[in-house]
A protein has these predicted regions:
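C-terminal non-catalytic scaffold/interaction domains in large multidomain proteins
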Residues: 1-197
Length: 197
């Protein structure tokens, strides 16, 4: 699946960064891999480069994100956020981070910019990887909880030695989410949701 965007992620990220003072901008660029290298730096590495603690870097990062969200540039990027919201919705409302990024671009620098835009934007929410699920983005908390709960239930009801063919697994999973909007109850989206875990 390849999704064409009506905006340029690198230009949008650059515009959002203009709302920041130089040091905050540099920290965000390093933290999210928005510079010449798409490699992200850890809080610790950035702290050592600036001679400050990891916690201070985290505070600067959080302040910078809030500054961007209150800026004129953020408001001007509304169409960007709306488009990403529609994409996530079309992919099921909750989607594995790497699948979302790969569907838009394979370029690591572009993916870093998209990740940054998602972090900054409303109504995007990210859940960290855990023992049950991969990193994922969602726009509706209730839907995300419903899907994750149904996936846990599906896997709990499978026996370790049980082989289940994909169509049967999809059918069973869809029976667990009968109260989810019809727009999401497709085989393609069910497969995408099964990929969350």
């Amino acid at each position: 699946m390849k999704i064409a965007l009506n905006f340029k992620p690198k230009q949008s990220a650059k515009k959002l960064l203009l709302a920041l003072q130089e040091r905050s901008r540099d920290i965000i660029i390093k933290r999210y891999g928005l510079g010449k290298s798409a490699n992200r730096m850890t809080l610790d590495a950035i702290g050592k480069a600036y001679g400050i603690t990891r916690e201070r870097v985290r505070q600067i990062e959080n302040h910078a994100i809030n500054t961007i969200r209150k800026s004129k540039n953020y408001t001007e990027e509304k169409a960007t956020f709306d488009e990403l919201e529609k994409i996530i919705s079309s992919m099921g409302g909750i989607v594995v981070e790497q699948e979302l990024l790969d569907a838009i671009s394979r370029d690591s620098a572009t993916q870093s910019c998209l990740n940054f835009i998602l972090v900054i934007g409303h109504p995007f929410n990210k859940m960290k990887e855990d023992e049950d699920f991969k990193y994922r983005w969602f726009i509706d908390n209730h839907l995300a909880e419903k899907i994750q709960g149904s996936l846990k239930k599906l896997y709990e009801n499978l026996k370790d030695d049980q082989l289940v063919i994909e169509p049967e697994m999809i059918k069973t999973f869809l029976s667990y989410i009968e109260d989810v909007s019809e727009q999401y109850r497709t085989e393609e989206i069910a497969k995408r949701w099964l990929n969350l875990s």
